């Protein structure tokens, strides 16, 4: 065992909890500071000598070497790869070093240190290396052609020399160029189509550029295209792309191209599918008509759902029921559609037929399954699984060097590096060890591993791992302060950040409850939060929960105390929420949620409400009914949980 693991593992047994925590904190601060300094070009080998046996010392070295990657001596780089062979840090270094070797055209060294990769840039670097060292043999040609034909999208600039040599040797035949043009057309990449066409004979080049122009923006020149299968496929590609931006224009243009080029019913169906999809996704007035124009053979699960939602949004209950019954059995038997089939039977005067559907749905611990249990006035179905793993097995997994490094990297806020070490550890683990690794990670506050690494129906019953209890005191305090249910606050945190206080979204939402800086500042002022220091304060868990919970309270007051509308506004913002309210002002909550046009928000509202039920169970052993919870009733009867058929 690495000597430095003694403080990390043995002290957990030998030292007092307080001393152990202080020791670990000091070690983490030291390695974090050293890595930060190395990235700034301030690596001092003598000053960091005491860290040499730290599990993360390789990442410290990596940070220092990467800083000077373009001038790094080969011997030093190869020594690093040798010392850390088999570790994630070695492959991370290799991925940084090989492009540097390509930039300085050190082709022999690149070849000597090459390791198979799916990264197109690295593959091109290796092909350049082989070509430059006189190894552009038949295998080289085959490999270069495989890279070409598999690239529907643009490739890095480093690939241009590869394809130039391939073309000069006759390896980029017109047929191969057309193969990539076709792939790029399917991917709706007109610029790639044009680039791939260069080198075609003049007449073919003109036709290829015409095809690319059509995919970019359909025009009447296509009416005079050769009446062949390629023309038909590319016409479909271009019309599908147009349908996303302007479904009405695509609908108007389809008939003329269908007639001129002889589009098959299947090909026309693909375009009609996109026209209908991008119409109904915004509930435009022509939605029902355009959905009806799509052949049933062109429907997939996505469009089946939208046909059902569109009828629901119009309040056409018979049409919605018919739409569900046209779904394939595997889709129709999902708890969501069983629930809505039952609800629609009730709305069309057939309540007796709904009971069996509710019974089937109620067997699943989902949003719609919980609603079905409410309908039947029966306990919620929840079957926790206890694998009964031994402490020795867990301790063995916890000692895995890659897992130790992964957790330590997580602790010092290096999530991408932590994920690489985690992936490396999992390559050696069987299913039970993987499950135990999730438990070890959760015990160290790395809760999202339970979301990303647990698999299959049985592991999804590990509710203690999937729904962690953390920051309980703060959640309860802020929930009480704002007259909200703590289970709801926990569910929001679980849905927003999986209890990661350092989470940051592409939209710059920050912390546990993913609060935007502008919202944070506004809410902090409105509640008189002392000590709020700007956006960085949102990474403080107590501050984030205080602001996020107060913001939920403000939204609740704005939306008449209705949690399901409040949750939608928390995710999507006030403008779309106001639009959905005005479009369907008197809808039952379940139908209102299902007809939300944003997929993310539609799923988010149902997820948070279902998570609230599970967190209520975790906190209290029973739960407020979901039917009451959705509409803000907090004093109703509470419901027990039962397991009908757990193995």
Regions found by a protein language model. Name each.
Residues 41, 105, 134, 188, ...:
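Residue-level detector of the short coil/turn that links helix A to helix B
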Residues 57, 62, 256-259, 263, ...:
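Catalytic glycan-binding domains that act on GlcNAc-containing polysaccharides
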Residues 65-66, 81-82, 94-99, 269-283, ...:
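Alpha-helical adaptor scaffolds
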Residues 45-49, 77-81, 110-114, 141-148, ...:
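Inward-facing hydrophobic residues that define packing positions of alpha-helical scaffold repeats
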Residues 19-69, 382-403, 411:
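N-terminal leader/linker segments that initiate helical-solenoid repeat arrays
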Residues 22-30, 52-59, 71-73, 85-94, ...:
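Generic helix N-cap/helix-start motif at coil->alpha-helix transitions
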């Amino acid at each position: 065992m690495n000597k430095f693991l003694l403080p990390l593992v043995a002290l957990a047994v030998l030292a007092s909890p307080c001393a152990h925590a202080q020791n670990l904190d000091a070690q983490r601060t030291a390695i974090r500071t050293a890595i930060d300094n190395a990235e700034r070009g301030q690596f001092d080998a003598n000053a960091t000598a005491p860290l040499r046996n730290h599990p993360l010392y390789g990442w410290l070295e990596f940070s220092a070497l990467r800083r000077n990657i373009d001038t790094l001596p080969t011997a030093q780089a190869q020594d690093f790869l040798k010392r850390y062979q088999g570790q994630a840090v070695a492959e991370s270094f290799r991925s940084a070093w090989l492009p540097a070797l390509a930039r300085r055209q050190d082709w022999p060294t690149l070849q000597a240190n090459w390791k198979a990769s799916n990264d197109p840039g690295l593959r091109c670097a290796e092909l350049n290396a082989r070509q430059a060292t006189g190894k552009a043999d038949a295998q080289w040609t085959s490999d270069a052609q495989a890279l070409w034909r598999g690239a529907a999208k643009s490739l890095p600039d480093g690939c241009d020399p590869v394809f130039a040599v391939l073309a000069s040797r006759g390896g980029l035949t017109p047929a191969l160029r057309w193969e990539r043009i076709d792939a790029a057309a399917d991917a709706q990449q007109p610029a790639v189509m044009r680039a791939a066409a260069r080198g075609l004979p003049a007449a073919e080049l003109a036709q290829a550029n015409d095809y690319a122009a059509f995919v970019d923006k359909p025009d009447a020149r296509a009416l005079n295209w050769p009446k062949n299968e390629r023309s038909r496929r590319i016409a479909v590609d271009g019309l599908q792309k147009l349908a996303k931006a302007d479904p009405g224009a695509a609908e108007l243009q389809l008939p003329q191209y269908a007639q001129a080029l002889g589009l098959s019913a299947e090909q026309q169906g693909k375009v009609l599918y996109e026209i209908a999809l991008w119409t109904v996704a915004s509930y435009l007035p022509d939605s029902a008509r355009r959905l009806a124009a799509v052949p049933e053979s062109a429907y997939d699960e996505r469009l089946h759902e939208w046909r059902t939602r569109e009828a629901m949004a119009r309040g056409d209950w018979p049409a919605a029921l018919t739409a569900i019954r046209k779904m394939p059995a595997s889709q129709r038997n999902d708890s969501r559609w069983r629930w809505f089939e039952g609800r629609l039977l009730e709305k069309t005067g057939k309540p007796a037929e709904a009971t069996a559907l509710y019974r089937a749905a109620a067997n699943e611990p989902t949003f719609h399954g919980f609603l079905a249990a409410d309908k039947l006035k029966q306990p919620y179905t929840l079957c926790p699984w206890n694998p009964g793993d031994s402490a020795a097995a867990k301790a063995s997994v916890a000692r895995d060097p890659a897992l130790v490094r992964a957790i330590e990297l997580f602790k010092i806020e290096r999530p991408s590096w932590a994920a690489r070490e985690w992936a490396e550890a999992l390559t050696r683990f069987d299913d039970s060890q993987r499950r135990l690794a999730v438990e070890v990670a959760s015990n160290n506050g790395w809760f999202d591993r339970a979301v990303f690494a647990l698999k299959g129906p049985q592991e999804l019953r590990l509710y203690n791992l999937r729904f962690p209890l953390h920051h309980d005191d703060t959640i309860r305090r802020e929930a009480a302060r704002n007259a909200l249910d703590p289970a709801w606050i926990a569910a929001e945190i679980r849905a927003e950040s999986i209890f990661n206080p350092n989470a940051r979204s592409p939209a710059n939402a920050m912390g546990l409850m993913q609060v935007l800086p502008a919202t944070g500042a506004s809410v902090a002022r409105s509640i008189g939060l002392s000590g709020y220091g700007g956006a960085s304060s949102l990474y403080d868990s107590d501050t984030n929960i205080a602001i996020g919970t107060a913001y939920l309270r403000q939204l609740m007051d704005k939306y008449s105390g209705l949690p399901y509308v409040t949750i939608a506004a928390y995710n999507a913002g006030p403008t779309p929420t106001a639009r959905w309210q005005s479009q369907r002002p008197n809808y039952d909550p379940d139908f209102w949620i299902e007809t939300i046009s944003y997929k993310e928000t539609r799923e988010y509202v149902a997820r948070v409400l279902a998570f609230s039920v599970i967190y209520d169970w975790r906190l209290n052993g029973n739960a407020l009914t979901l039917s009451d919870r959705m509409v803000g009733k907090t004093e109703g009867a509470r419901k027990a949980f039962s397991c009908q058929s757990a193995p």
